Amino acid sequence: MGVWKKLTFLLLSLLLLVGLGQPLWPAATALALRWFLGDPTCFVLLGLAFLGRPWISSWIPHWLSLAAAALTLSLLPPRPPPELRWLHKDVAFAFKLLFYGLNLRRRLNRHPPELFVDALEQQAQARPDQVALVCTGSEGCSITNRELNAKACQAAWALKAKLKEATIQEDKGATAILVLPSKSISALSVFLGLAKLGCPVAWINPHSRGMPLLHSVQSSGASVLIVDPDLQENLEEVLPKLLAENIRCFYLGHSSPTPGVEALGAALDAAPSDPVPAKLRANIKWKSPAIFIYTSGTTGLPKPAILSHERVIQMSNVLSFCGRTADDVVYNVLPLYHSMGLVLGVLGCLQLGATCVLAPKFSASRYWAECRQYSVTVVLYVGEVLRYLCNVPGQPEDKKHTVRFALGNGLRADVWENFQQRFGPIQIWELYGSTEGNVGLMNYVGHCGAVGKTSCFIRMLTPLELVQFDIETAEPVRDKQGFCIPVETGKPGLLLTKIRKNQPFLGYRGSQDETKRKLVANVRQVGDLYYNTGDVLALDQEGFFYFRDRLGDTFRWKGENVSTREVEGVLSILDFLEEVNVYGVTVPGCEGKVGMAAVKLAPGKTFDGQKLYQHVRSWLPAYATPHFIRIQDSLEITNTYKLVKSQLAREGFDVGVIADPLYILDNKAETFRSLMPDVYQAVCEGTWKL
């Protein structure tokens, strides 16, 4: 019988005693003797009690209570279960989670349901003059709640007039937005205006171009694309195909240098700022798509993950759940095309009524100066952000700031400790989750290095499993009955989260094949259904989760998910490469994995490092660019004609192990140069910058 089963049986026995009118103090005394005094002291006291029974027999309770005390001693483990250390916080968190869930359901059950854009209108009435958004940088500006709501209303009326009502309804198509971070406030005004009309919005990575950009727009089902004028070249590369599919394109500016593309600026300025009636979005349900955020998933090009209005409100309430208030100032250096930057950051501040400070890009040298300038109290991060801050040489004013809380994901334990030692006792709440996932984890006790915490209470609300997996196929291992095999405590396992009515998995827009690939059936019993996160975690005895690795083709580098198939598609365009296999490799001292490609040269061709460098710099964002190239005579495949990546990833880029020619990305020389032992040593020691 397990510890928790014993404790449950003991609790039922004690409840029976209460029902029979018997005292519980003997059982409580037994518990105190065993757990708080230890076994030696416990048995000494019991021996003394036995010797002194003639003197204490007059107040010995009924034999049932004595039996309960004996049962308590026999069932109790020698020490309290580790989980009980955090029992008070587990109970408080579970009640808080239940309260927020019931409140969310109440809001969504209204007719029409209360949507995330309603928070803007509420803040515009309650706190009209409070600053909602601040954009830092050379073109720094700010906007109040009243002004932001007025601009959103102008955008709604302008787009309604431009596009006609049939074009902007939820069941007819989305609107895609492609903007640089410097245009954040303008883009957010348009985004909120579209939300007032009930139109879902797809946020596209502004680094996308060519085929990935075209695929992103098409897969979202967008009938409209709004583009930053500074991304003119990106748009014009794919414009003919967009126009051929009747996708209307607009520049978020006052002029258009491109035939076939209109400018929105004048229409936005001329539109009225009258309130937008809620009836225009009356057809929206809480399960309706609100936002599409692109994710690499485990395979293929970026896919638009569906964030319903329910999910957006859940995520945007995280700051409130963490105890933040309208008096907080949140510093956000994360991109708006990520759920952390847009939903938890911007929309989270709108829900709170707090001020969100948007930095166009992360700068370790300016980070704390801007935090001081804007009196920031909360910072959002991915693990790399805090590591970069710790890598900057120490300054006397490192602890002179008003930041008291940090929220994010991907923070290593060593960086966590270093960050708090250097910059002060900043409370850190680490999160775990994926954009398309149906369940998230939260380290609500601030335990260093953990990505989340669970308990028996949380498991009832959010069932999940850690199961054994095949590292080659990246699939769960099954037992003889066909069910998944749970891992032991402390062992790494593939995280699966149960799909239920109140925790649905909406998947991706478009083909259902991509969505079905993320589903795992018959995990614990016949007929159940789980979401495969593709992540490997470990669970310790106290209920803390620790991130171990990512499965499948996707790896994480510099805070971004990198799809190997997307990179393979870009590299395969080169005429001197016949076959390409991209994978992630570990680099000492670095978080995540950096890209590496094993390639087979086309017959009669030679490797051209300069041409490859120019190609990847033109077609791939920096985080997706492979840093190492390995030339092989042939690429190994499985029986099902899939490229073998695991062995290559294990071998990495070690020049002492690999006999094949190896090359490394050299940004100074703008080429891929031969990887020599001295350069390999520099990479391992951290003196060669990746």
Curated annotation (Swiss-Prot):
One of its GO terms (cellular component) is protein-containing complex. Predominantly expressed in liver (at protein level). It is an enzyme of class 6 (ligase). Residues 1-30, 77-690 are cytoplasmic. AMP binds at F292, I293, Y294, T295, S296, G297, T298, T299, G300, L301, P302, K303. It catalyses: a fatty acid(in) = a fatty acid(out); cholate + ATP + CoA = choloyl-CoA + AMP + diphosphate; (25R)-3alpha,7alpha,12alpha-trihydroxy-5beta-cholestan-26-oate + ATP + CoA = (25R)-3alpha,7alpha,12alpha-trihydroxy-5beta-cholestan-26-oyl-CoA + AMP + diphosphate; chenodeoxycholate + ATP + CoA = chenodeoxycholoyl-CoA + AMP + diphosphate. One of its GO terms (molecular function) is long-chain fatty acid-CoA ligase activity. This is Long-chain fatty acid transport protein 5. It comes from Rattus norvegicus (Rat). The lineage of its organism: Eukaryota, Metazoa, Chordata, Craniata, Vertebrata. The gene is Slc27a5.
